[in-house]
């Protein structure tokens, strides 16, 4: 049976605009709800769709980086967000940066101007009946957030990111770290970076002097959510971390048989073991200082940080428990979620989630099989990550090559390896396009 009704898309940000576009261009009818300017958020200032509230950069445009590959995949699928960004681009070296007013204006013009899109400017306070995509973003209104909490279960909806940095496993110096669990309980599941007292002192001093990201007004209470940044912990006294995430007890170094002065633990972050996260290292440091401090840790001197630690206001779901790789709710087949609230991190990633949700919401109305993008693609690897990650430790993730399955052939040089991964991803998306 084909479901003929319109699809309600809630939120005209990057994800909602992309979702509406993908539905409309396939012949589906969309009712696109946007509460601005009737009700503004603390971060937005206009009534335009896809308003960029932070940076005007959509990050790297080269196929040598993951987000560049993601953009190229989206170009293949006629993404309205990437189309508008390309048209509104300003000089930015190897990155794709935009004139933010021109960009938002173009997205608004394309989406509003499509004959299959009806725009409704009002706040949505309940999850709508019938086919719908919720794409209300990190600043979801309080009324709808309460409804989402009731729908998903209070323990599965979060209001703040507190993400520790994630490291590319290939860049960890295995000669300096060792595999062990505390007191040897269970399997040896952690990589341990041991520190001498002298190494710890240098690390501690750099950490407390490192520059942090200024908090915005609506983020002032962020640290009272039971999650303390590592630098705030350090500022409370030199030994505080030694009784917290850097506690060495039960982690004797097998090479020496002795207990180090301090230990930084790394925990495997994905099933293929290509990514490791830094246990207890949620941080509000700026990215430059964050990299410098992390590279002072033994074994991480040459670490590639695929996702930096962040702490900010962000309404997001525990997607491993709630969503399928199609961005479809496990609980309600006609309900989809898109954008940053699904646990993808970044402008482009949010739009990509909207693209998949839009395609699949339309397919649902046509009683067609929903599209699960190949994991070799950046689009598919993100969908796989947010739905298959460990639900207990789930935190938002941006596009990176550590998410895709390894190549069949080992390529040691990073540049050549990334080029091969990009080539495979784009070949895969081209083969997959006929299904979407």
Curated annotation (Swiss-Prot):
EC number: 2.1.1.74
Sorted UniProt keywords: Cytoplasm, FAD, Flavoprotein, Methyltransferase, NAD, NADP, Transferase, tRNA processing
Presence of the UniProt keyword Methyltransferase in the record: yes
GO cellular component terms listed in the entry, alphabetical order: cytosol
Cofactor: FAD
Pfam families: GIDA
SUPFAM superfamilies: FAD/NAD(P)-binding domain
Record-level Gene Ontology MF annotations: flavin adenine dinucleotide binding; tRNA (uracil(54)-C5)-methyltransferase activity, 5,10-methylenetetrahydrofolate-dependent
Keyword NAD: yes
Compartments in which it is found: Cytoplasm
Positions of FAD binding: 11-16
Catalytic function, reaction form: uridine(54) in tRNA + (6R)-5,10-methylene-5,6,7,8-tetrahydrofolate + NADH + H(+) = 5-methyluridine(54) in tRNA + (6S)-5,6,7,8-tetrahydrofolate + NAD(+); uridine(54) in tRNA + (6R)-5,10-methylene-5,6,7,8-tetrahydrofolate + NADPH + H(+) = 5-methyluridine(54) in tRNA + (6S)-5,6,7,8-tetrahydrofolate + NADP(+)
Protein origin, superkingdom: Bacteria
Disulfide bonds: none
GO biological process: tRNA methylation; tRNA wobble uridine modification
Assigned protein family: Belongs to the MnmG family. TrmFO subfamily.
Record's function text: Catalyzes the folate-dependent formation of 5-methyl-uridine at position 54 (M-5-U54) in all tRNAs.
Protein name as annotated: Methylenetetrahydrofolate--tRNA-(uracil-5-)-methyltransferase TrmFO
Source organism of the structure: Shouchella clausii (strain KSM-K16) (Alkalihalobacillus clausii)
Lineage: Bacteria, Bacillati, Bacillota, Bacilli, Bacillales
């Amino acid at each position: 049976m084909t479901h003929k009704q319109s699809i309600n898309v809630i939120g005209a940000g990057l994800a909602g605009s992309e979702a509406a576009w993908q539905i409309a261009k396939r012949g589906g009818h969309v009712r696109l709800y946007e509460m601005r300017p009737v009700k503004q958020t603390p971060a937005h200032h206009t009534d335009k769709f896809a308003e960029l509230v932070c940076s005007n950069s959509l990050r790297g445009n080269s196929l040598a980086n993951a987000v560049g590959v993601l953009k190229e995949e989206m170009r293949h699928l006629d993404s309205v967000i990437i189309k508008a960004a390309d048209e509104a681009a300003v000089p930015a070296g190897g990155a794709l940066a935009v004139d933010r007013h021109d960009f938002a204006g173009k997205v608004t013009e394309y989406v509003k101007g499509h004959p299959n899109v009806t725009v409704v400017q009002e706040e949505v306070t309940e999850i709508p009946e019938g086919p719908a995509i919720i794409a209300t973003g990190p600043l979801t209104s309080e009324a709808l957030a309460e409804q989402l909490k009731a729908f998903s279960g209070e323990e599965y909806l979060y209001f703040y990111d507190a993400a520790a940095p994630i490291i590319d496993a290939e860049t960890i110096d295995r000669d300096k770290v060792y595999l062990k669990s505390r007191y040897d309980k269970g399997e040896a599941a952690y990589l341990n970076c041991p520190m001498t007292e002298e190494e710890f002192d240098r690390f501690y001093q750099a950490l407390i002097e490192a520059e942090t990201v200024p908090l915005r007004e609506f983020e002032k209470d962020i640290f009272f959510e039971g999650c303390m940044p590592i630098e705030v912990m350090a500022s409370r006294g030199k030994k505080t971390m030694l009784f917290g995430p850097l506690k060495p007890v039960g982690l004797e170094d097998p090479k020496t048989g002795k207990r180090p002065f301090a230990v930084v633990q790394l925990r495997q972050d994905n099933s293929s073991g290509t990514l490791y996260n830094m246990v207890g290292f949620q941080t509000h440091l700026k990215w430059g200082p964050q990299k410098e401090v992390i590279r002072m840790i033994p074994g991480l001197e040459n670490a590639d940080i695929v996702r930096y630690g962040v702490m900010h206001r962000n309404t997001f779901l525990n997607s491993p428990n709630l969503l399928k790789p199609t961005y479809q709710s496990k609980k309600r087949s006609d309900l989809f979620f898109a954008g940053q609230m699904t646990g993808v991190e970044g402008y482009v990633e949010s739009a990509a989630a909207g693209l998949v949700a839009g395609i699949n919401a339309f397919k649902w109305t046509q009683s067609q099989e929903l599209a699960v993008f190949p994991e070799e693609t950046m689009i598919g690897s993100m969908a796989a990550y947010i739905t298959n990650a460990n639900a207990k430790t789930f935190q938002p993730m941006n596009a990176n090559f550590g998410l895709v399955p390894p190549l069949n052939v080992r390529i040691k040089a990073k540049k050549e390896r990334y080029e091969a991964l990009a080539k495979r991803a784009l070949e895969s998306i081209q083969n997959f396009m006929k299904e979407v």
